[in-house]
C-alpha cells in the first residue's frame, strides 16, 4: 500500500521527511515529491505549495503518477471555532470552500458546480484517528477536535472575513488554504482521504504574528499525529 501525505510548505513536511531513512526526490511542475517509508509504510510525501491551485495540481500529480491508496493532508490551520487553542489538532470530518458562490444557479454557498457541497473524510480513517488521539491527548494540555474545515485562497484574520464564513458555515472549526482542494481531487479520483491540521493561530488580528511564531509547533503536532495514525494502517 502506498500512502500519499501532503503539506503545503517546507515547515509542514520537514519533520515527516526527517523520519524517512532514505528518500528519492522527484520534482514535477514545482511540486516536490519525497518517496520512501514512514513508520514502516510506503509513502509519497508531497510539498505542494500554498493555495488551492498548487494543492490541486500536486494532488492530481500524486494520484496519477504514484497511485496512492490513501491521501492524508498535514499542516497548520487557523482556529475559528469556540474553545480552540494553539497546538490543538483538528481532524476534519467535512470540508467546503469558503470563497465559492454560484448560488444564483441553485448551488449551496461554497459548492463548486457538479461537485458535492461538502467533502467527507473517510469514515474508517476518522474512526482510527478518534481511537488513537483519544489516548494520545489524554494527558496533554492540547486536544483533538473533529469538525468542519473551510478552505479559502486568503489568510483569514479580519472580522469581516469571519462574518462571511460564520454566516454560511456557523459550525466551522478551522480555516486554511488547501484542504478542500485536496479533498476534491481525492473525491474525483475515488481515493479515501483524511485531513489532519494543527492550530497555529486563532484567525484574528494577531494571526500573522501567531502563525510565524507557532507554525513549527503546529507542524510538529500534526506530523506526530500522522505518524501515530500510520502505525495502525
Swiss-Prot record:
Pfam families: PNP_UDP_1
Coiled-coil residue spans: none
Gene Ontology biological process: L-methionine salvage from methylthioadenosine; L-methionine salvage from S-adenosylmethionine; nucleoside catabolic process
Record EC number: 3.2.2.9
Biological or metabolic pathway of the protein: Amino-acid biosynthesis; L-methionine biosynthesis via salvage pathway; S-methyl-5-thio-alpha-D-ribose 1-phosphate from S-methyl-5'-thioadenosine (hydrolase route): step 1/2
GO molecular function ontology, one term from the record: adenosylhomocysteine nucleosidase activity
Record-linked SUPFAM superfamilies: Purine and uridine phosphorylases
Keywords attached to this entry: Amino-acid biosynthesis, Hydrolase, Methionine biosynthesis
Reactions the enzyme catalyzes: S-adenosyl-L-homocysteine + H2O = S-(5-deoxy-D-ribos-5-yl)-L-homocysteine + adenine; S-methyl-5'-thioadenosine + H2O = 5-(methylsulfanyl)-D-ribose + adenine; 5'-deoxyadenosine + H2O = 5-deoxy-D-ribose + adenine
Residues that, per the record, bind substrate: 78, 156, 177-178
Entry GO terms, CC: cytosol
Highest taxon, organism lineage: Bacteria
Broad EC category: hydrolase
Function: Catalyzes the irreversible cleavage of the glycosidic bond in both 5'-methylthioadenosine (MTA) and S-adenosylhomocysteine (SAH/AdoHcy) to adenine and the corresponding thioribose, 5'-methylthioribose and S-ribosylhomocysteine, respectively. Also cleaves 5'-deoxyadenosine, a toxic by-product of radical S-adenosylmethionine (SAM) enzymes, into 5-deoxyribose and adenine.
NCBIfam families the record matches: MTA_SAH-Nsdase, PRK05584.1
Family indicated by similarity: Belongs to the PNP/UDP phosphorylase family. MtnN subfamily.
PANTHER family recorded: 5'-METHYLTHIOADENOSINE/S-ADENOSYLHOMOCYSTEINE NUCLEOSIDASE, 5'-METHYLTHIOADENOSINE_S-ADENOSYLHOMOCYSTEINE NUCLEOSIDASE
Protein name stated in the entry: 5'-methylthioadenosine/S-adenosylhomocysteine nucleosidase
Amino acid at each position: 500500500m502506498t500512502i500519499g501525505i501532503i503539506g503545503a510548505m517546507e515547515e509542514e513536511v520537514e519533520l515527516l521527511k526527517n523520519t524517512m531513512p532514505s528518500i528519492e526526490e522527484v520534482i514535477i511542475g514545482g511540486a516536490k515529491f519525497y518517496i520512501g517509508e514512514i513508520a514502516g509504510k510506503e509513502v509519497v510525501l508531497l510539498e505542494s505549495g500554498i493555495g488551492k491551485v498548487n494543492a490541486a495540481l500536486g494532488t492530481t500529480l500524486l494520484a496519477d503518477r504514484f497511485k496512492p491508496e490513501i491521501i492524508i493532508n498535514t499542516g497548520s490551520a487557523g482556529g475559528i471555532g469556540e474553545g480552540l487553542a494553539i497546538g490543538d489538532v483538528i481532524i476534519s470530518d467535512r470540508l467546503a470552500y469558503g470563497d465559492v458562490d454560484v448560488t444564483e444557479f441553485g448551488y449551496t454557498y461554497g459548492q463548486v458546480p457538479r461537485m458535492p457541497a461538502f467533502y467527507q473524510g473517510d469514515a474508517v480513517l476518522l474512526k482510527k484517528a478518534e481511537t488513537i488521539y483519544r489516548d494520545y491527548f489524554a494527558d496533554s494540555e492540547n486536544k483533538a477536535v473533529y469538525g468542519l474545515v473551510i478552505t479559502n485562497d486568503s489568510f483569514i484574520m479580519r472580522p469581516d472575513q469571519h462574518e462571511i464564513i460564520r454566516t454560511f458555515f456557523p459550525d466551522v472549526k478551522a480555516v486554511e488554504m488547501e484542504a478542500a482542494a485536496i479533498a476534491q481531487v481525492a473525491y474525483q479520483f475515488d481515493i479515501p482521504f483524511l485531513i489532519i491540521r494543527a492550530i497555529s493561530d486563532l484567525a484574528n488580528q494577531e494571526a500573522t504574528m501567531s502563525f510565524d511564531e507557532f507554525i513549527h509547533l503546529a507542524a510538529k503536532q500534526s506530523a506526530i499525529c500522522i505518524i501515530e495514525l500510520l502505525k495502525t494502517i
